[in-house]
UniProtKB/Swiss-Prot annotation:
Superkingdom to which the source organism belongs: Eukaryota
Gene: VENTXP1
Listed name of the protein: Putative tumor antigen NA88-A
Tissue distribution of the protein: Expressed in testis and melanoma cell lines.
Species per Swiss-Prot/TrEMBL record: Homo sapiens
Length: 33
């Protein structure tokens, strides 16, 4: 479930956080529409 960007990311925690943030933003966007 981890995005490919997490592989090149030096900090896995940062990658996971950014992934969650992206998912939350997508959900908010869907809710807006």
């Amino acid at each position: 479930m981890s995005p490919p960007s997490s592989m090149c990311s030096p900090v896995p925690l940062l990658a996971a956080a950014s992934g969650q943030n992206r998912m939350t933003q997508g959900q908010h966007f869907l809710q807006k529409v």
